[in-house]
Amino acid sequence: MAQKPEEQLKELGSKLDLAPVSKDSLLKLLKEAAVCLSELEQSPPPAVLKSIQPFLDAVIKPEILNHQDKDVKLLVASCVSEITRITAPEAPYSDNIMKDIFQLIVSAFAGLNDVSGPSFGRRVLILETVAKYRSCVVMLDLECDDLVKEVFTTFLDVARDDHPEIVFSSMQNIMIVLLEESEDVQEHLLLILLSKLGRNRSDVRDAARRLAMKVIEHCAPKVESDIKQFLISSMSGDSRFSSSQIDYHEVIYDLYRCAPQALSGVAPYLTGELLADKLETRLKVVGLVGELFSLPGRVISEEFDSIFLEFLKRLTDRVVEVRMAILDHIKDCLLSDPLRAEASQIISALCDRLLDYDENIRKQVVAVICDVSVSALTSIPVDTMKLVAERLRDKAILVKTYTMERLTELFRVYCLRCADGKVDTGDFNWIPGKILRCLYDKDFRSDTIEYILCSSLFPSDFSVRDKVKHWIQIFSGFDKVETKAFEKILEQRQRIQQEMQRYLSIKQTQQTADAPEIQKKILFGFRVMSRAFSDPPKTEQNFLILDQLKDANIWKILTNLLDPNTSITQASRIRDDMLKILSEKHSLYDFLSTLSIKCSYLLFSKEYVKEILAEVSVRKSSKNTLGIQPCMDFLGLLACFCPSLFDGAEEELISFLKDDDEMMKEGTLKILAKAGGTIRENLIVLASSVDLLLERICVEGNRKQAKYAVHALASITKDDGLKSLSVLYKRLVDMLEDKRYQPAVLQCLGCIAQIAMPVYETRESEVVEFIRSKILKLKSETVDDKKLSWDDKSEICQLKIYGIKTLVKSYLPFKDAQLRAGVDDLLGILKNILSFGEVSEDLESSSVDKAHLRLAAAKAVLRLSRHWDDKIPIEIFHLTLKTPEIPFPTAKKIFLGKVHQYVKDRVLEMKYACSFLFDITGSNVLESEEDKHNLADIIQHSYQTKVRKISAQTDANSVTLYPHHILPYLVHALAHHSCPDVEKCKDVKEYEMIYRQLYLIISMLLHKEEDGKTEDIDKEREYVPTIILIFHSIKQSEDVTDATKSKNSHAICELGLSIINHLTQKEPDLQGEITPVSLPPTLYKPSEKVEGDKSQVGEEKLWLADETVLLHFRALKLESHADASVIPQTSENEVMIDGESDGNEIPLGKIVERLRAQGTKTRKGKKNKSVPAEDENGKNDVDVLKMVREINLDHLQMLDKFESSNGHKHSPSERAEICQRDQKGNKRNVGDATSVVSVPKRRRSSSGHSPYKFSNSGPKVQLKASEDELHLESDMDKNVSLDSHDENSDQEKMLESISPRKRKKSLSSKLKITESDWALTDVERSRSAGGGDSKLKSASGSMKKRKNVSGLAKCSTKENKLVNDELIGCRIEVWWPMDKRFYEGTVKSYDSTKQRHVILYEDGDVEVLNLKKEQWELIDTGGKTAKKSRTSKGNSKKKRSSGSKPKNPDGVQRDEDPVTTTPKGKRTPKKNLKQLHPKDTPKSLSLEHEKVESRNKKRRSSALPKTEYSGEAGEEKSESEGKSLKEGEDDEEVVNKEEDLQEAKTESSGDAEGKEAEHDDSDTEGKQENNEMEREAEENAETSDNETLGAWKSKVGKSISRTAI
């Protein structure tokens, strides 16, 4: 019988007590003991404990417990661990012994890293025992902190991925128990755990990292506060953890996965790091946060929502590297869960970055969105994908080509999903249309587009049937532009196929024909085909090389590719074979690759036609009538350009022709009309009665069917339909009396006249007589006109319109139109209809019928003018122009739409565009925005085609070379039909409408861009003289049709010349004698000079040219293409309010004109009235000259400030003294503050917009004014005269000397000051200005301005020539006056036509500047020759922001007066203040100051004392956040601006956009008069049209309180 374990242990204890000498005997005893101990249960009876007590005592003997052999130590550890298990919960030994035991047990754990070792199993048992029975808690009771630390360190060091799960869980449980049972988490334990966290660490195993995360996850409530404290301390730079070498970013990542609640207080610190100035910090935290949000299955907590939002805002970071990193993480974020809750926010942020200024960012955004869309087609909204597609128009070829590739890939994926039956895959059939639009892009052209359509658009294994289904949907979604591009591609392919077939045919017969003649034909064919390639000259050379090839296989393959019977599969295979024959190294490889696509039927083949016809039948049988129309339309288009594809489809076409479905029948007729000549033989074989079927449709079908049936009948017969049409024609004429078929019969008669004129002429007289007497002279029933609408025309009216169309078609045959006679009779009919609305004045009909007939007659004139323009009398031309006067808006829209269409298609002379000017509604001309756009489009189109016209003209002085050639026709029409007799009628109001019409057309001719700006000064110099010459030529001519109207024409020309002077704000500079241009001889002839009259013909002064009359016209509210100008007869306050209503500013010129208009109106009533010195209500007239002078003085004061800031004028003591005087002055006038005028804010550009809105009205702020400012203001205020005559005289002088100049391409207000003025010191100016107190109040908008003042000093010609394209790539410094400092940037490009440089600043801002008018310095030429700017060499850069307090070098303000600042929002285009550096400023100071301020580049938000946002008080943002937001948003608007510059060549000026303005409301009291200073300011200051509304309001506010007249 075996001994019991306790008995064995008793014996073993006795043996151990004797201390065995050998190691082996000791190991044997310990092994036996371990086995016995494992067999005992926990908490055995006392007898058992007593029995094993000898062993318990023996095993802890020092010589055993402290044995040095590792095997002995392991067995001892195994035994004592079992002993602790058995005696639990009581400790088997004393505290000191237990410490030694746990030290032994912990040392045993160190061997767990050897999984394959013989002792691994025993160590695992020890680990399990300790974990299961929680004996490790005793270590805490014994305060074995070092031992506990060793446990943590050991476990994390020995953890392996190949450990059994029991080992991992046991270690995890032990560590959790030690943490949970401890009163406080020891810092070193936490650091041990955190030190193992982090991604991609080579020094830490994944198992250890996973173990640490599991422990933290289970102990999160216990360790949360300590972790939070550690992280906050580490992120705030606490030196206590600086030596821990723990990367808290990596810790945060793992904590977010295992214990996100521990990060609750970390969010603000992460947000702060996202806004840090240091790039490395931002990049690191971006990487962390990006990976956190990319974790799959994670929902962003509320705590991290603020971090997420700021993370998205980093997409606007000024550093490209940061933005690129965020895009990568956003991509991972969306791919992990495309439908996550934050997807819409992410996508919205991505859309904004599609307009980033960096092309690599834009490309990456496209990549991100397309990658996400490919993974889940419905994850990205269609509207977002269409925004991505707009990058096909990107200015960078890198972006547009990449976008093309990704959209093509996306469409392929979409096709595959559709083929798999996944119906919920979104709609991407619009993508091919966007690709087709790129046909007009010079970087793509047809070569790229055709390759994509043929080879890349659909999956390679896609069946023809699937392709057909998609093509039908694609085609049905095309808009006009896409349809036109698609037709263009098909047309080019047809031309190349025809020319290649002709070339191959000639090549086969070359041996038998005349070689030179053949060569000539071949070269001509090559030239024709080359035009369809992207590089025609190179292509033509490649054709010549191809012609020399002797390889018969190449020619055989090309012949097969041109065969329409070759299937798509065969064509693709033989094309590949041809390219293999050549190999990629061959010079013709790329050329033949493109040619084989263009001349083959890879795009559409006969297989397509058969599948489409089958699809029609399927939809017909399924009663899907809506799906039939796009199929028939698609077939009709293929029939136009690929008629050979319908060979073999005759049977289906005949069945469709016989079908009752009208859409199928009409579509088939169109196909037969286009492709009938190709398939006529097969048609006759299949159905000999097809011509009879077509004849029946001609009579019984509707008008459209009848039209196609006639053309089909002519197409399918061999003699061009002469025989068939003769029979049909006879039958139709005989049926004219049958009212049932009259519409179709008239249609057929017109078509026959166009196709077969000999047939039509056989009975033409009968047809014409019938239409004239039996149709056009029909009387309509009397109807109440008041109840009729445009659609209520009578059947008789409709029949008359059909008759007119038939007569018109008879004079527009397809061949030999000029051989027709008798068009005068038709024109006579049209004249009567245009005049009376009927063919005879005696005929009565409703106003609706007359309107319809007038419209039909006008459209007929437009069509006839293509061939008969020289036969159309001037009177009919005038009547046609007046068609928009029809009192039905629909009639105007239809007619003007036709004019626009015909002129754009080059089938109508531009002179008919005059009709737009006769669209008069009330007192407005061309009120419809659509019609305005169309007229502008016509003018733009005419400018674009002018070069081609010039090359075709022989008369260089011909006015028809220019778009302006419509002016003679317009003047003639106005003189005859709108203008009263100028010698009899002296009522100015009768000429107001003529002035409006002229103003509109001239402004559009001069300002031909959509925003009303002339492209550049050079072009204005070309256009203005041309228009002036036209008017002068008319004045020197005589009316051909009615000499009595000549005076009217001359008077209208006077108005036109005054409008030009008004728009250009300068007298025309016509060098030499005026050379008349060639005017239309049908309108004007040179005037005969009377003998003895020495005056030049046509130069006599007419009363309409009188200045007072012109002032009346200029006071009108005029609508032009550029702007809405002067508001008539309104008070000053109304003028200002109206100017603010649209958020724009009113330029100086316009306000002066308004004041002039008021003056002419009110002067009469005020002559005899005495006026008080001041009018507090501000209802009197304003001294305009006074205001102009004050504005000029404001500029002078700004220059004084600028000089002072340069250190030129005042010492610190002097500046302090002036500052004190200013403060005193301000304090005295505090109680006199008046209301502050709100200024409309200005967007950066017309296309961009800011998501951040600021209040329009800023708070009231007191500004300090320098003494010289106050004195200068005093001078001007003192100069007001109380005499009404004197004041009127002053106003008149001002109006003559100050002309508000319309800016053409400048954002700056310009002020010219002589060098002597610049040299004046502040003290001298103060002395000359005199004394007095002044009050200066100012309110700023929400953002500061950058003012531009040019001409501060004369520059040499040599200096002017230094700015050119050689600066590209150089680094320069550009002066920002309102910031009082330079900013560094790189010159990226130069537009020589506009003399504009594109500057990329270091912070990412982009600005387009004319450096010749800027203050700048060259820093680094990049190896190029250094050039200087217009500035002086000794310029100082030591400057401070205007309005801010002076600071010491340490940044402490000198003045303790507390002020608040207006926060800067998004940087807008500022007015450029161009300032010369004073020569005597030490440059070292400026460089030192530059270094100090380089850290604060973005702190340029206020050039005025600080104020708070109204409505947003207390809102604070960190500096970095403000920087990134502003710059990121600027990036978007810069790209919009650059794309507009490239595609539309437009640039905003201050007249078209609203700008932020600074208010200067100053009121002066008791100032002394100083005429000398006033004259100096008046002579050297030039007011600008870019003066803002705010500044003008302030001046008005100062002046209206004083007496005027």
Swiss-Prot record:
The keyword DNA repair applies. Residues 1425-1442, 1464-1476 have a biased composition (Basic residues). One of its GO terms (biological process) is homologous recombination. Residues 1155-1182, 1203-1262, 1279-1307, 1324-1353, 1423-1605 are annotated as: Disordered. A motif (Nuclear localization signal 2) lies at residues 1426-1433. GO terms for cellular component: mitochondrion; nucleus; plastid. It is found in: Nucleus. Keywords: Cell cycle, Cell division, DNA damage, DNA repair, Mitosis, Nucleus, Phosphoprotein, Repeat. Gene3D superfamilies: 2.30.30.140, Leucine-rich Repeat Variant. The modification Phosphothreonine is found at T1588. Residues 1575-1585 have a biased composition (Acidic residues). Disruption phenotype: Weak impact on meiosis such as formation of some chromosome bridges at late anaphase I and telophase I in forming pollen, but severe effects on development, fertility, somatic homologous recombination (HR) and DNA repair, especially in plants lacking PDS5A, PDS5B, PDS5C, PDS5D and PDS5E. The modification Phosphoserine is found at S1274, S1299, S1524, S1562, S1584. Residues 1211-1225, 1279-1295, 1477-1495, 1514-1527, 1534-1574 have a biased composition (Basic and acidic residues). InterPro entries: ARM-like, ARM-type_fold, Pds5. Belongs to the PDS5 family. Interacts with the cohesin complex. Interacts with DEK3. This is Sister chromatid cohesion protein PDS5 homolog A. It comes from Arabidopsis thaliana. The lineage of its organism: Eukaryota, Viridiplantae, Streptophyta, Embryophyta, Tracheophyta.
